[in-house]
Amino acid sequence: MRTKAEIIKEFGKSEADTGSTEVQIALLTEKINHLTEHLRVHKKDFHSRLGLLKMVGQRKRLLAYLTKKDLEGYRALIAKLGIRK
């Protein structure tokens, strides 16, 4: 799992840019990937599964916002993160 600072440095406009949509989506994607691996091992951890579903919903809303705001940025971000087919 990459650190938060590394993700912010890669996707943010500056190192203090923690609130931009791209950074938020990248951070959520990292958390989602980590939690997905956890749930593969711990299949009955329903509490974490609920948290995962909430994170996926939040990322979906942020991606919809980014689509409306900056379509080219959206396409570049999903290609970089590999979250769409």
Swiss-Prot record:
UniProt entry keywords in alphabetical sequence = Ribonucleoprotein, Ribosomal protein, RNA-binding, rRNA-binding
Q: Name one GO molecular function term.
A: rRNA binding
InterPro entries in the cross-refs: Ribosomal_uS15, Ribosomal_uS15_bac-type, uS15_NS1_RNA-bd_sf
Any Gene Ontology CC annotation: cytosolic small ribosomal subunit
* Gene3D superfamilies tied to this protein: 6.10.250.3130, S15/NS1, RNA-binding (1.10.287.10)
Q: Name one Pfam family in it.
A: Ribosomal_S15
Swiss-Prot/TrEMBL GO biological process terms: translation
Q: Which HAMAP family match?
A: Ribosomal_uS15_B
Report quaternary structure and partners: Part of the 30S ribosomal subunit. Forms a bridge to the 50S subunit in the 70S ribosome, contacting the 23S rRNA.
Q: Its family?
A: Belongs to the universal ribosomal protein uS15 family.
Annotated PANTHER family: RIBOSOMAL PROTEIN S15, BACTERIAL AND ORGANELLAR, SMALL RIBOSOMAL SUBUNIT PROTEIN US15M
Q: What does this protein do?
A: One of the primary rRNA binding proteins, it binds directly to 16S rRNA where it helps nucleate assembly of the platform of the 30S subunit by binding and bridging several RNA helices of the 16S rRNA. Forms an intersubunit bridge (bridge B4) with the 23S rRNA of the 50S subunit in the ribosome.
Q: What is this protein called?
A: Small ribosomal subunit protein uS15
